[in-house]
Amino acid sequence: MTGWPTEPDLRATHHATQALAQRLRLPFRSQTWRGQVGNWIGAGVGSSIDFQDHRPYLPGDDPRHIDWRAYGRTGHYIMKLYREEVTPLVDVALDLSDSMLFDDAKRTRTAELLYFSLESARQSDASLRLFAVRGPHWVPWELASILAYRPPVFADTATGAHEPPVLRNIPWRTGALRVFISDLLFAGSPEPLLQPLTGGKGRGLIFAPYCRAEASPDWAGDIEFVDCENGHRQIQHIESRLLRRYEDAYRRHHELWREHCQKRAVTLARVAAEQPLAATLQAEALPVGAVELWV
């Protein structure tokens, strides 16, 4: 893997996203959570101070939750029910295809989305796991390594590295918010990537960074193109008609992803690289529910 930001750049990115996560975060409040004990309202009953309802006492119930006032009125043991308090689960997978790193602004935005997701989870006391994906290969990315601004280490970066990312082998946790950061610039149906994001009661969310160079290029005349995935070079004469064909194909590709995400109930937010992160998240991610205001 080449082109990962330097340690000073990552340190600055991390510092900025720490501040941003105090105003915007991943959509925790809009979810109903199940999981280990924590600070978030869950789907079941538990022992928080948030009193919810009554039910008759059953053998094995905690007698500390008996409503003695109700017993005095009715002569029956009545249990107080409380909302369960749980810890949200957040699994983040970062696509490290070369197309994510070829452009300076896009590379920075990719790192910003990673550290924003990380800080959203940490500042919300969520249980966090991170993975790096490159073609069919994935590795767990230890939090300590990310906080030390070290890139992930793949045992094999050559075989299949230029293929679309494979998510089905990642050990996603049941009921987790599954965040996939990828530009989605690979051919084929979106379904093989979307199914792992929603299986096992998962909640899928995709941040798709993009840059002006790919979305609205200013090509004209003879242009030398370099495939950032395999290094292949080709000189192509670009005229306005060919440029429009490219722009139409690019637009249709992302419309296809949007349609499939809607069918799968996966939240998709495309995130422009040239604007400040806070501005583009508010403009593009907030309206679709990929982030929420934190006040």
What are these regions (language model features)?
Residues 1-43, 56-64, 70, 75, ...:
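Exposed, interaction-prone extracellular/peripheral surfaces
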Residues 49-50:
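Charged, amphipathic alpha-helical linkers/stalks
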